[in-house]
């Protein structure tokens, strides 16, 4: 941290939050989303474009890599989502029955690259969270009775046999699993009803961390088996 080197692949402007993703299977491989998806295999010293103008000039907003197969990548631009299964040589659009809303987040199951969750912004009731088990050929609406607020992020609990997922909304954190479309608020009056921008699970401590818009960083023990009983603690620094 004493010095930094600029490794941006292009002088073009990206999205407000330009996505970068590190391949967990090879830390020298980095992906960056601008008007194209850029890939580096040498830690950012050089970059190659692995999309062919599939976004028609739009910026790539989200990148999700499969941990089980590095050739499988999902990206989105605004309301469109794309998949490659050969490392970027060929891409297919997999919107199918998804709503034409802004995609805020994509996550891929760590052991099954065909299981994917996407979340949406906006204020259209019942169009918040979708899941696929076949790589995007078909999408299942799992929004249930979520309140009509934007969903900003989603995190999968890799320790859960029920494929538990947490979502960050404009009014805190909610939890559900693959067996139901029932969402429970995971705040319990400890975490303020505030915008959640990012969720991350720290498995060494078995805790979920929630980054808020203007209210700091909060953490909580992961849900085990009982209904959510949340007891957030506050950290003043990220």
Task: Tell what function each PLM region has.
Residues 1-227:
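Extracellular glycan-interacting surfaces
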């Amino acid at each position: 941290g004493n010095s930094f080197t600029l490794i941006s692949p292009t002088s073009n402007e990206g999205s407000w939050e330009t996505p970068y993703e590190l391949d967990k299977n090879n830390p020298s491989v980095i992906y960056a989303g601008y008007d194209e998806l850029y890939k580096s295999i040498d830690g950012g010293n050089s970059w190659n474009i692995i999309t062919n103008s599939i976004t028609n000039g739009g910026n790539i907003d989200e990148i999700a890599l499969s941990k089980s197969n590095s050739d499988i990548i999902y990206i989105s631009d605004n309301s469109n989502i794309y998949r490659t299964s050969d490392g970027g040589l060929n891409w297919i659009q997999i919107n199918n029955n998804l709503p034409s809303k802004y995609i805020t987040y994509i996550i891929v199951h760590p052991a099954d690259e065909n299981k994917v969750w996407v979340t949406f912004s906006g204020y259209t009731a019942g169009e918040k969270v979708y899941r696929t088990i076949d790589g995007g050929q078909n999408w299942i609406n799992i929004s249930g009775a979520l309140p009509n607020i934007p969903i900003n992020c989603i995190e999968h609990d890799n320790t859960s046999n029920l494929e538990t997922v947490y979502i960050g909304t404009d009014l805190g954190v909610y939890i559900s699993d693959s067996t139901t479309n029932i969402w429970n608020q995971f705040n319990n009056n400890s975490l303020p009803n505030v915008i959640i921008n990012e969720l991350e699970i720290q498995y060494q401590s078995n805790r979920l961390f929630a980054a808020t818009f203007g209210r700091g960083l909060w953490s909580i023990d992961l849900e085990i088996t009982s209904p959510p009983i949340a007891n957030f603690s506050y950290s003043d620094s990220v």
